[in-house]
Amino acid sequence: MPTIQQLIRHERQTLKAKTKSPALRACPERRGVCTRVYTSTPKKPNSALRKVARVRLTSGFEVTAYIGGIGHNLQEHSVVLIRGGRVKDLPGVRYHIIRGTLDTAGVKDRRQSRSKYGAKAPKE
């Protein structure tokens, strides 16, 4: 605990909030190129093969991004758009790949929450 005299000499410094998605550099999205597309297993107690990609961004960072939805068409050298948002059961995955933009196709036969997966409206 500082004395009043110490506080007069040096005022308290405000804590700066640390960003949860530093690779975006204060942008809503960033473009990048997939360097590796693979599956990863989640932390306990969950069990699955989650689809993830290693992406080299235009900001110079190389990050791991999650590929949401059922099925995808991504491979090495695919150009993708990523957004922030972590995956709770995959350590180190702090970004999501946006479906339906650039080289990423939307999810086929998706009827609900279509805007999140880049799916077009179904033909009546």
Curated annotation (Swiss-Prot):
The keyword Ubl conjugation does not apply. GO terms for biological process: translation. PROSITE patterns: RIBOSOMAL_S12. The modification 3-methylthioaspartic acid is found at residue 89. The keyword Ribosomal protein applies. Residues 104-124 are annotated as: Disordered. InterPro entries: NA-bd_OB-fold, Ribosomal_uS12, Ribosomal_uS12_bac. CDD domains: Ribosomal_S12. Pfam families: Ribosom_S12_S23 (PF00164). One of its GO terms (cellular component) is small ribosomal subunit. GO terms for molecular function: rRNA binding; structural constituent of ribosome; tRNA binding. Keywords: Methylation, Ribonucleoprotein, Ribosomal protein, RNA-binding, rRNA-binding, tRNA-binding. Part of the 30S ribosomal subunit. Contacts proteins S8 and S17. May interact with IF1 in the 30S initiation complex. With S4 and S5 plays an important role in translational accuracy. Belongs to the universal ribosomal protein uS12 family. This is Small ribosomal subunit protein uS12. It comes from Synechococcus sp. (strain CC9311).
